[in-house]
């Protein structure tokens, strides 16, 4: 679909579901994203005093292949009822995506007519809308080598789909692609605070290297010594994502070096409420998680254990340690340090 055709469709939808609609409102939109609200009907009978429940915030990502592939919806909530609604939307989208080539062609032929028909809707103000010339391409600000990685992932996904060997979910894959693009644009990534590498080109399995920590910390000094001894000057993390990401957190563990302190558990798991279902939010970005882990290691006075058995860090042991600590904290709660402690 052309940019003008997509813009025409979105503008038309925004004119129908405006900010005064009684049930569903498009708060703002861009060519690749919608920010919407669903106003939940109050549970009390009409006429009785009540406070209306807060609206549900929904996000819609429009992929490059639209309309051949359906938009991806996600919500900033861990409510299982909302998750089931999204699953039903996925089923509906799959059924509706089997249209014929003639229908797609017909839609393309109607784009220009629609654009002309709704020119009079230009007076509607959308806070996030910008002139086309000023809009950032989703690839803007990304280095060529990283664009090549993104393109390789897209090609692999298409080939897997054709071969019937699709892994993961559409929802998780689209969100992870967005996270990866955001990381590639990030100044923290570009300045070498951390790096990201996909393991075996899998979108669901990442190696993250923490390459810069607080220079005044003992951990920084340890990493300098480690560089001299072993040629390693980073902390290697493994991020594993499930099909229901972003509604479940990634599983994160330290791969190397062996650390003491810093809330690092046996096997390399991390004792952080942020990485549990209880403390996780689907609104969190992966970069914010990476930066929080970096800060937590320093705050927890992590130190490199020189000469330690490197085989003690593995996935099975990390998962065991993680599950044990989560059970303990579910019973006893999590300790929140004073604000002055960061």
From Swiss-Prot:
GO biological-process terms attached to the record: protein K48-linked ubiquitination
Post-translational modification: Auto-ubiquitinated in vitro.
Location of this chain's protein in the cell: Cytoplasm
Keyword Ribosomal protein in annotation: no
Domain UBC core as annotated: residue spans: 171-335
List of catalytic residues: 271 (glycyl thioester intermediate)
Compositional bias (Acidic residues): 104-116
Pathway entry: Protein modification; protein ubiquitination
Keyword Kinase among UniProt keywords: no
GO molecular function: ATP binding; ubiquitin conjugating enzyme activity; ubiquitin-protein transferase activity
Spans annotated as Disordered: 88-116
Main location: cytoplasm
Catalytic activity: S-ubiquitinyl-[E1 ubiquitin-activating enzyme]-L-cysteine + [E2 ubiquitin-conjugating enzyme]-L-cysteine = [E1 ubiquitin-activating enzyme]-L-cysteine + S-ubiquitinyl-[E2 ubiquitin-conjugating enzyme]-L-cysteine
Role of this protein: Accepts ubiquitin from the E1 complex and catalyzes its covalent attachment to other proteins. In vitro catalyzes 'Lys-48'-linked polyubiquitination.
Protein name: Ubiquitin-conjugating enzyme E2 Q2
Organism of this sequence: Bos taurus (Bovine)
